[in-house]
UniProtKB/Swiss-Prot annotation:
<dbReference type="Pfam" id="PF00107">
    <property type="entry name" value="ADH_zinc_N"/>
</dbReference>
<feature type="binding site">
    <location>
        <position position="63"/>
    </location>
    <ligand>
        <name>Zn(2+) 1</name>
    </ligand>
</feature>
<keyword id="KW-0520">NAD</keyword>
<feature type="binding site">
    <location>
        <position position="96"/>
    </location>
    <ligand>
        <name>Zn(2+) 2</name>
    </ligand>
</feature>
<dbReference type="GO" id="GO:0008270">
    <property type="term" value="F:zinc ion binding"/>
</dbReference>
<dbReference type="GO" id="GO:0005737">
    <property type="term" value="C:cytoplasm"/>
</dbReference>
<feature type="site" description="Important for catalytic activity for the proton relay mechanism but does not participate directly in the coordination of zinc atom">
    <location>
        <position position="148"/>
    </location>
</feature>
<dbReference type="InterPro" id="IPR011032">
    <property type="entry name" value="GroES-like_sf"/>
</dbReference>
<comment type="similarity">
    <text>Belongs to the zinc-containing alcohol dehydrogenase family.</text>
</comment>
<feature type="binding site">
    <location>
        <position position="195"/>
    </location>
    <ligand>
        <name>NAD(+)</name>
    </ligand>
</feature>
<feature type="binding site">
    <location>
        <position position="64"/>
    </location>
    <ligand>
        <name>Zn(2+) 1</name>
    </ligand>
</feature>
<dbReference type="InterPro" id="IPR050129">
    <property type="entry name" value="Zn_alcohol_dh"/>
</dbReference>
<feature type="binding site">
    <location>
        <position position="107"/>
    </location>
    <ligand>
        <name>Zn(2+) 2</name>
    </ligand>
</feature>
<keyword id="KW-0560">Oxidoreductase</keyword>
<comment type="function">
    <text>Catalyzes the NAD(+)-dependent oxidation of L-threonine to 2-amino-3-ketobutyrate.</text>
</comment>
<keyword id="KW-0479">Metal-binding</keyword>
<feature type="active site" description="Charge relay system">
    <location>
        <position position="40"/>
    </location>
</feature>
Length: 341
């Protein structure tokens, strides 16, 4: 079958031909319709330090997709041939304390589709049936293909009560923008997003944020005054992994504020811990999606009117995958979809 693989330990990604994956007793085989390029895939393409330590070569990559079940393992129940599905990209062990305690997303033995095992940038993908999620008929393929990153946004944004709260989102990548849109949709008062990328900030405006702030040109405290804010942000969503952004967030949070961290900062990031202690801030780390509560919330949010369509800015047939990666690497895009049909 046709697949996009990391064939060499150097920058790039290559179209290749690989065997169709084998189906296990508890697996489903999915014929891929559409995939989306993740920031992780860009890291793998660029072959940065994280990728060099993490990604086996050669391997099919990719983990954002929508497809149709074409084969079912003999032990599988609850799925049928023809079901339209996406899937949770974190394969968990099922036997550790967190898995057995219902906290599956915290499995210490997690394996990532397209990161530690073959991914979805291929004509067919095999995953455990446990990880498959049926997509409601009224959700189009394009949106279903980005459920994985949308789930990161939902998990992060819905970590805390948002109704009537003022929210700061640092980092206007696709996940940050979707998180900001979720906050507005569920009833936050002011949702302010910060970045230095004008293209992404304009995209955030299309998604309904209160203010999109280019911190290289505007002062965040001036924006807060403009909005009539006197006590700081109630909720912070750190999506950038940029130390200056997190330090600014800490300084502009209200006392008792709550912060969810999805962005991955450098391991030696220095912050003013006095801000955390004397403001009584609560900081929560976010990894992946809660299985499977986040997935049901994703579907329900879209069915209740959350419009994510502006975040999908480019679509290419799979044979033009290089254009997709080039536009993603430029930073001048939202989500990029690759069509396998």
């Amino acid at each position: 079958m046709k697949a996009l693989s990391k064939l060499k330990a150097q920058p790039g990604i290559w179209m290749t031909d690989v065997p169709v994956p084998e189906l296990g007793h508890n697996d489903v085989m999915i014929k891929i319709r559409k995939t989306a390029i993740c920031g992780t895939d860009v890291h793998i393409y660029n072959w940065d330090e994280w990728s060099q330590k993490t990604i086996p070569v050669p391997m099919v990559v990719g983990h954002e997709y929508i497809g149709e079940i074409v084969a079912i393992g003999q032990e599988v129940k609850g799925f049928n041939i023809g079901d339209r599905v996406s899937g949770e990209g974190h394969i968990t062990c099922g036997h550790c304390r967190n898995c057995r305690g219902g906290r599956t997303h915290l499995c210490r033995n997690t394996i990532g589709v397209g990161v530690n095992r073959p991914g979805c940038f291929a004509e067919y993908l095999v995953i455990p049936a446990f990880n498959a999620f049926k997509i409601p008929d009224n959700i189009p393929d394009e949106l279903a293909a980005i459920f994985d990153p949308f789930g990161n946004a939902v998990h992060t944004a819905l970590s805390f009560d948002l109704v009537g709260e003022d929210v700061l989102v640092s980092g206007a990548g696709p996940i940050g923008i979707m998180a900001a849109a979720i906050c507005k949709h569920v009833g936050a008062r002011h949702v302010v997003i910060t970045d230095v990328n004008e293209y992404r900030l304009d995209l955030a405006k299309k998604m309904g944020v209160t203010r999109a702030v280019n911190v290289s040109k505007e002062n965040l405290t001036d924006v807060m005054k403009e909005l009539g804010m006197t006590e700081g942000f109630d909720v912070g969503l750190e999506m950038s992994g940029a130390p200056p952004a997190f330090r600014t967030m800490l300084s502009t949070m209200n006392h008792g504020g709550r912060i969810a961290l999805l962005g991955i900062p450098p391991s030696d990031m220095a912050i003013d811990w006095g801000q955390v202690i004397f403001k009584g801030l609560f900081i929560k780390g976010i990894y992946g999606r809660e299985m499977f509560e986040t997935w049901y919330k994703m579907a329900a949010l879209i069915q209740s009117g959350l419009d994510l369509s502006p975040i999908i800015t480019h679509q290419f047939p799979i044979d033009e995958f290089q254009k997709g990666f080039d536009i993603m690497r430029s930073g001048q895009s939202g989500k990029v979809i690759l069509d396998w049909q």
